[in-house]
Amino acid sequence: SGISGLSAAYYLSKKHHVDLFEREDHFGGHSHTIDIFFDEKKVSVDIGFIVFNFQTYPNLINFFKENDIQIEKSNMSFSVSVDNTNFEYCGKGLSGIFSNKSNLFNIEFLKMFFDIIKFYKKSDQLSISNEKITLGEYLKINKLSKTFVDYHIIPMVSAIWSMPPYEASRMPISFFLRFFQNHGLFKLKSRPQWYTVTNRSRTYVNKILSQISGEHYK
């Protein structure tokens, strides 16, 4: 019962009696909030669904408006830190990429930096084809540096889809291109504004559950 199941049950329950059966230990599927303690304070963290934007998620936005779900601005940030090295950066502007000043003199890092620019510009303009090649094969064809592959694009794909690196490299290139183009992730400037649910995603999960007519089993 992720957002698709819950929204379907929500609309059906307006005219019918609907019972929910959930095989997991929580309702909401990918929209799952947990509480952790940091510096002796409880912090609520979304571990699946986190951000959305107005361009790509119009139906979700309308659904939130209908249910008076409060939202707030967020960002789609990305950072990498390689264990036991000084190799780290974040993707928020040049100050983030070169937050570690030693990166300015790191040849491998500079290769990655220029590959990011080249790869993003080319991929954003590339027409989406039905070629049955993987992301890993696409990266090899374009002769991108190992540093770019291992410390940028594969970690980013792994983070977005919550998958190990070897699975990320097997992703169909057509799917990868479509997702990144639709979400503006190839844009070096003028990226879409991202939003998140105020007080985390369980806020809307609980509100929707309270409006579904029948019993809730899990």
Segments (PLM) and residue ranges:
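N-terminal Rossmann-fold NAD(P) dinucleotide-binding loop
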Residues: G5
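Glycine-rich FAD pyrophosphate-binding loop
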Residues: S13-F37
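Glycine-rich Rossmann-fold phosphate-binding loop(s) that bind the pyrophosphate
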Residues: S1-G2
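Glycine-/proline-rich flexible loop or hinge segments
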Residues: E40-F49, Y120, K187-P192
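N-terminal glycine-rich dinucleotide-binding loop that anchors FAD/FMN and/or NAD(P) in oxidoreductases
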Residues: I34-L60
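Mobile amphipathic helical/loop "lid" adjacent to a hydrophobic cofactor/ligand pocket
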Residues: F54-R178, N182
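Helical element adjacent to the flavin cofactor pocket in flavoenzyme catalytic cores
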Residues: F176-K218
